[in-house]
Amino acid sequence: MSDWDKPTVIGFRQQKPTVAKGSTLNAAQRAGLVISSESKGAGQSKGPADHQRIAKLDRDDAPKPPEKVSADVGKAVATARMAIKNAEGKSMTQKELATSVNAKPQDIADLESGRAVPDQALLGKLERKLNVKLRGAKNLIGTPLHPKKK
């Protein structure tokens, strides 16, 4: 019946005697006891883990693909390119447009089809060459860059 009377303490451990100070450490050495002094956790400059950031990264697991140009930009480039006529009366080709703005013909084809990643330098060159707005608000894309003066 005496087992019922003892309180159960969870996490209680017997304290071991420790040697911490210099004088008691020297006395233990004179007595011939085994001494080991270690610095626990030395060299760890890492702080606690940021669990909020780790959880956010776990939720957002897939990398996002780069954004593409809108179809409005591609249509505006194609219509403005077709409107420009050369000396023979034919419309400008993608290759001719690419050479005039110092770009690859494939870049122009990707831009017109809507597969290209927006390149601000290329869009700026195309805006100046075609005289059509390609950046900015959606309702302004395709409008003349500099309207004709009256």
From Swiss-Prot:
State the UniProt keywords alphabetically: Activator, DNA-binding, Transcription, Transcription regulation
For region Disordered, the annotated ranges are 36-71
Q: Which PROSITE patterns match?
A: HTH_CROC1
Please report the stretch or stretches of sequence annotated as the HTH cro/C1-type domain: 84-137
Sequence ranges of Basic and acidic residues compositional bias? 48-70
Alphabetically, the GO molecular function entries are:
DNA binding
Task: Spell out the Gene3D superfamilies in the cross-references.
Answer: lambda repressor-like DNA-binding domains
* DNA-binding region listed in the record: 94-113
State whether keyword DNA-binding applies.
yes
One GO CC term on file: nucleus
Top-rank taxon of the source lineage equals Eukaryota
Q: What residue range is the signal peptide?
A: none
State the function annotated in the UniProt record. Answer: Transcriptional coactivator that stimulates GCN4-dependent transcriptional activity by bridging the DNA-binding region of GCN4 and TBP (SPT15), thereby recruiting TBP to GCN4-bound promoters. Involved in induction of the ribosome quality control (RQC) pathway; a pathway that degrades nascent peptide chains during problematic translation. Required to prevent stalled ribosomes from frameshifting.
UniProt record similarity statement: Belongs to the MBF1 family.
Protein known as: Multiprotein-bridging factor 1
The organism named in the record is Cryptococcus neoformans var. neoformans serotype D (strain JEC21 / ATCC MYA-565)
Q: Which gene encodes it?
A: MBF1
